[in-house]
UniProtKB/Swiss-Prot annotation:
Keywords: Ribonucleoprotein, Ribosomal protein, RNA-binding, rRNA-binding, tRNA-binding. Pfam families: Ribosomal_S7. This is Small ribosomal subunit protein uS7. One of its GO terms (biological process) is translation. The gene is rpsG.
Length: 156
């Protein structure tokens, strides 16, 4: 059923340590079973490890990693005359962040390591350096869009 208008976005408070709404959204995405304090604990300890490894401020390092993971374009399926085409479309800024968070968390969870704190910090450091699974996922999405550039005129 189509909506008459776009769903309203909830206002999310900034996190207490860095004062950033982006980090607050990331912590919410990281959270399992409503255990926010555990998610915050994992994130802040991972940021401490990132600070040790890179020497950069936690907020600065996190923002740089997210910028390197954000997709600029993605493909969406569009059915035209019995055929389905993968049409490249630009990604909205809020969706860019959402996808970057999801990819970073998924890559961290799949990564080998002792604790989620270490895995998350290692993935963030790799993302800053332009490598790691999350950046590879972004590159895959960009390659798909590049390969289907011929269908860009089907954009809606």
């Amino acid at each position: 059923m189509a909506r008459r208008r776009r769903a309203q976005t909830r206002k999310i408070d900034a996190d207490p340590v860095y004062g950033s709404v982006v980090i607050s959204k990331f912590i919410n995405k990281l959270m399992y079973d409503g255990k926010k304090s555990k998610a915050e604990n994992i994130f802040y300890k991972a940021m401490d490890l990132v600070k040790e490894k890179t020497g950069k401020d936690g907020l600065e390092a996190f923002n740089e990693a997210i910028e390197n993971i954000k997709p600029r374009v993605e493909v969406k399926s569009r059915r035209v005359g019995g055929s389905t085409y993968q049409v490249p479309v630009d990604v909205r800024p809020d969706r860019q962040n959402s996808l970057a968070f999801t990819w970073l968390i998924d890559a961290s969870r799949k990564r080998g390591g002792r604790s989620m704190i270490e895995r998350l910090s290692n993935e963030i450091v790799d993302a800053i350096d332009g490598k790691g699974q999350a950046v590879a996922k972004r590159d895959t999405v960009h390659r798909m869009a590049e390969g289907n550039k011929a269908f860009a005129h089907f954009r809606w």
